Curated annotation (Swiss-Prot):
Component of the ubiquinol-cytochrome c reductase complex (complex III or cytochrome b-c1 complex) that is part of the mitochondrial respiratory chain. The b-c1 complex mediates electron transfer from ubiquinol to cytochrome c. Contributes to the generation of a proton gradient across the mitochondrial membrane that is then used for ATP synthesis. The gene is MT-CYB. This is Cytochrome b. One of its GO terms (cellular component) is mitochondrial inner membrane. Binds 2 heme b groups non-covalently. The cytochrome bc1 complex contains 3 respiratory subunits (MT-CYB, CYC1 and UQCRFS1), 2 core proteins (UQCRC1 and UQCRC2) and probably 6 low-molecular weight proteins. The chain crosses the membrane at residues 25-45, 69-90, 105-125, 170-190, 218-238, 280-300, 312-332, 339-358. Heme b b562 binds at H75, H174. Keywords: Electron transport, Heme, Iron, Membrane, Metal-binding, Mitochondrion, Mitochondrion inner membrane, Respiratory chain, Transmembrane, Transmembrane helix, Transport, Ubiquinone.
Amino acid sequence: MPHQQILMLFGLLPVATNISTWWNFGSMLLTCSMLQVLTGFFLAMHYTANINMAFSSIIHIIRDVPYGWLMQNLHAIGASMFFICIYIHIARGLYYGSYLNKKTWLSGTTLLIMLMATAFFGYVLPWGQMSFWAATVITNLLTAIPYLGNTMTTWLWGGFAINDPTLTRFFALHFILPFGIISLSSLHIMLLHEEGSSNPLGTNSDIDKIPFHPYHTYKDLLMLTMMITLLLMIVSFFPDIFNDPDNFSKANPLVTPQHIKPEWYFLFAYGILRSIPNKLGGALALTMSIMVLLAVPFTHTSKLRSMMFRPFMQLMFWTFTATFLVITWTATKPVEPPFTTISQAAALMYFLFFISNPIMGWMENKIMKM
């Protein structure tokens, strides 16, 4: 009987009739997280969190473990898929005003921070050259914190440099954080269904709703099939497309790579960090590039929820999207002109979007009164 009730709830869950494909990314993210937990579990069975054996254990997984190459590639490329989906999911939230459902938005932003931390810890685990140096650069930012910085860095490293204790605790954190993500995802979904999802028009959906099943289940399944097909195509034909060539060499603390950079999904934040010549200023800008999302629900001034009928805001949104891509691109380049100038201008425009959002809303309200 309880199972029937659950199915009834799922089947009769009322959803707005007009939600578009942009609303499918939530279910895709859920699938990504399930895939990551499963593949990660099998990888953890064969991985060794030791600086002398970590790199060799990855090679052992790929070469000797049955379907180990598939697990490793699904896990690595699955992380990229996860971030593609989450960035689209956030962009949809910004465009259609989903952030006005404050509890859902704040829990979602917390999820993003947890996901970024998990991905960072995971990037260090293969103990390749780029893994080691990316970890060194990013964890070193803690030293910019006045008074506490050096103590916190030593505490995080488990010593006076990145070494075996660092790798062990990063593996422990990479293993435990996904369980926190799953718990918070459940809360995120519960909070969403407390108020119900918005729709492209930004109007009240209560007047026109349909059952979730079969309409939206099939709609979700189509996008999931497309995502899994794309994932398997990349895994089969281009498994190293997102990898850094330096990471195919074992970590060597005595040799610094020519250009240190994290995974592609962190490049926008890394580009903002690099654009500021001051260490503390850069660390603050890096933190703010993500934390600024927390302020969005509290700075909405427009009488319209969605950007669908706000042409000025649409222009600003797509400029913001282009800015995001430009910062990502400049972060892959060396720290030299013209890339430094471009990244500084792009970083400024990135934050200007969040500042001009309430100003534009206020101006639109004035125009509508005329």
